UniProtKB/Swiss-Prot annotation:
It comes from the Archaea. The keyword Ribonucleoprotein applies. The keyword Ribosomal protein applies. Keywords: Ribonucleoprotein, Ribosomal protein, RNA-binding, rRNA-binding. HAMAP family: Ribosomal_uL18_A. Belongs to the universal ribosomal protein uL18 family. InterPro entries: Rbsml_uL18_euk (IPR005485). Part of the 50S ribosomal subunit. Contacts the 5S and 23S rRNAs. This is Large ribosomal subunit protein uL18. GO terms for biological process: ribosomal large subunit assembly; translation. Transmembrane segments: none annotated. GO terms for cellular component: cytosolic large ribosomal subunit. One of its GO terms (molecular function) is 5S rRNA binding.
Length: 214
């Protein structure tokens, strides 16, 4: 451990690997809500946060576990398509609360092109929230529909049926053939859209009002 008069003990949350204060400061300076994406071994969650002196206030949030309980999701809780759908759900809820713009907070995740963090970002963008980003870092449509998993499952089923059963046991137990995953993603997305169709209608109405005023 460092010693001497110039040594500074890092703040507790930085020591615990929870907060990058330098990055947090830059995000707070933007004056916009932060879209935070956090990932565990089983699930992931997306929050839209407002920075306050007493602590962050959650404006809107979504957890991938909700996809299973409320919208019939049968896939994994923390893969790329789950990240996209969770970001989409959180984005609609943010719009419902009046959040039109935000900045992405990746936390201590390493920003990797096409990763789950950016899949969640793509979901929020598709919901209608404006978030500064580069198109290059977003995963493609085929990726967030998990077509790569479906193709791998189809090939594995032909090559090694036993390994296929083990690898995709959770999907199969829930009644989903992994080869049908892209279509299932669309089904769940439509279920989310149906639950929050009033948000899309209100957002469209606001857009028309702005155009008239302009």
């Amino acid at each position: 451990m460092g010693r001497g008069p110039r040594y500074r003990v890092p703040l507790r949350r930085r020591r615990e690997g929870k907060t990058n204060y330098y990055r947090r400061f830059r995000l707070v300076k933007s004056g916009k809500p932060r879209m935070a994406v956090r990932i565990s071994n089983e699930y992931l969650w997306v929050q839209f946060l407002e920075a306050r002196i007493e602590g962050d206030r959650v404006i809107a949030a979504a957890h991938s576990r909700e996809l299973i309980k409320k919208f019939g999701w049968k896939g994994d809780g923390n893969n790329t398509c789950a990240a996209y759908l969770t970001g989409y759900l959180a984005g609609l809820r943010a719009l419902e609360k009046g959040v039109r713009e935000a900045v992405l907070d990746v936390g201590l995740h390493k920003p990797v092109k096409g990763s789950r963090v950016f899949a969640a970002l793509k979901g929020a963008l598709d919901a209608g929230v404006e978030i500064p980003h580069s198109e290059e870092i977003l995963p493609g449509d085929e990726r967030v529909r998990c077509e790569h998993i479906a193709q791998w499952a189809e090939a594995l089923k032909e090559e090694n049926a036993e390994l296929y059963q083990r690898q995709f046991s959770r999907y199969l137990d829930r009644g989903l053939n992994p080869e049908e995953l892209p279509g299932h993603v669309e089904e769940v997305k439509k279920a989310i859209e149906e639950a929050y169709k009033h948000v899309a209608e209100e957002t469209a109405a606001e857009g028309e009002e702005v155009e008239v005023k302009a």
